[in-house]
Amino acid sequence: MTSDSSDSRPAPAGSEPRQSPPRRALEWLFGRDVLTSPGAAAESPVGDPGRSVQLRLALLSFLMLFVELALIRWLGANIVYLSYYSNFVLLGSFLGIGIGFLRARSRINLFPWTPVALALLTAFVLRFPVQISHTSGTQLIFFGALKTTGLPTWLMLPVIFLAVAAVMTMIGEGVARTFVQFKPLDAYRLDILGSIVGIAAFSTLSFFNAKPLAWGIITAIVLLVLSGTRIGIIQFAALASLAGLLTANSLISHDLWSPYYRITVGARTQAQTIPVMVNGIPHQAITAAAKRPAIFYQPYTQAPRNPLNNVLVVGAGTGNDVAGALRMGAKHIDAVEIDPMIYKLGTKLNSDRPYQSPRVSAHINDGRAFLSQTKKKYDLILFALPDSLTLVAGQSSLRLESYLFTLQAIQSARAHLVPGTGVFAMYNYYRTTWLKDRLADTLDVAFGHAPCASSVGQHQQQLSVLTVSVSPAAVRCVNTWHRPANVLPPSTDDHPFVYLASNTIPSFYLLTLGLILLASLVLVRTVSGPYRKMTGFADLFFMGAAFMLLETKSVVQFALLFGTTWFVNALVFAGVLIAVLAAVETSRRVVIRRPQLLYAGLLAALAVAWVVPQESLLSLSVIPRFVLAVLIAFAPIFLANLVFTQRFRDVSDSTVAFAANLLGAMAGGVIEYVSLITGYRALLIVVAGLYGLAFLTGRRKLTAAKAAQEGPAALAPTTALTAST
């Protein structure tokens, strides 16, 4: 290995090579790790590098997942387009991490530039936020669609995607340069442990409604610890700038942060309403019940004999609809609101003080989950403007309220109504006739007769109320809904995309995904070199794509069974990582003589998940539902990771193999949009097909592994890893 200094004389024993003044100046500015000698990573010993290096890898993995989660939350709150492109930031993250792993042995070390990239991305977003979403068609309805502010979609989305990929490339390269010093499974184990701590830390911050300033401070501290005395003045200045930008923004904006939204509370208007915006979109206005339009009270006036002994309000928000129910004489109200911060605003700012009433019981929960957990019967169930304006967890195309509007959800609500006189009502600014008709038809199918339908306002500001009863005689309709010839069928729990006008992938999604794939191909080739170095790991690529779909299926399954709350999603992701860790620990100790059996077991687990529809578990009580859901969802995940780890344990190049798997996960994130056509259950078929491709492309490796494992060591504790275990 040659020195970069012009002085070729060997350095004295026990001392570092002397550096030329220009190089010392560069190190002072940019840090001592920016330039790496060719092949330095390749020359690193592989084995047990020691506690300090183990801690470094775990800390790097913590940073990687923590920053990924922070970017998903923060960018989605400031760039409204991202609230509707479900996994846009996630795709950019996987691309970046994959490229970073492919660069593990590059001469130029990009990891020290992470603070600079983060500071630039933060400054750009704060300078050019997008406050209102915009679409150019009617295939997908965004209730928040008003008009565009900020940079246009065609410019903002590519910039954000490339910026996220750049940041995660730098962090991923830092992980990879340490990852390569370990045996593959030892490195993977530390990576998973760091990731588990990362998701636990971010979930804790979400629980305490921490602002982005806290996320930035933790990121800066971890980067300082990882850099140590090798940090350069530019990196230090960038970290200071990052903290300064987030501090200034926190002091100026006075935004509140819930686990779901960036919440902005406006000043009281002349009409004595208080506007509330989430993620830069007008969401609701806190208004006194006496000043609300009469149409909000139609569910009560159309059923004058309803005793209103028990009322359920789903989407209780800041309390407007709860106050309205109290005003109309409700004796007891269960108010369900998913966002704890929105609820707290209602307790403080609503002049009617509905949440302080002894007749009101507040529940911070998902509406569908509450219905599945209660046995109460209600005289009135009201879905009051349940429009989340956000998606679940940055993964899958679910919105927080998706499972409220399916046929099965309305049937569940009907089952909770008092026989004979119970009334169900829902209202919102539906903004398009086909959507209102679709929901009215859903009520018609669930109740067996057409609902009452009333509207006020025009165009996108038209407020519509749909009211129906168990018995047609229980309500007095001024206008009864009439089914048009071209009405769309009700959405279902398997295909819960009520805002999608047809079972297709909207054209703007197709265009965006196509450009993402094209950009990814170009970036991987340009930054990381020829594709041929990954050809030997095609099976790992397909495993990554399949596993991403399995993870998505788990998220949506638990969202249906236990609610779309942030806490449920955090538990699912933590559960996935724990299942992965269990597979790693198993493969570190046990060699499977016939990996083909693992594929067979995985196929059987997928078949069980197919045979037992997720909605069939809703009839069970919470504990048996949870046990069966965990078994059905996590058995395939555990077996899939046994397949992966048995293959990964003996790879010749762990970072390239891991990169192939990560890029496969990105491809899986693109394939996930097929669910808009097929529904989520059909993803199991796609998963089975992808693992079939992994089996076919990896047959030679399976044969070689079997030949190497023949003998008494098979299916016994592995001797090669004894020292590290």
Give names to the regions the model predicted.
Residues 4, 21-725:
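Alpha-helical transmembrane segments of multi-pass membrane proteins
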Residues 1-10:
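N-terminal acidic, proline/glycine-rich, low-complexity intrinsically disordered segments
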Residues 9-20:
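N-terminal intrinsically disordered, low-complexity tails
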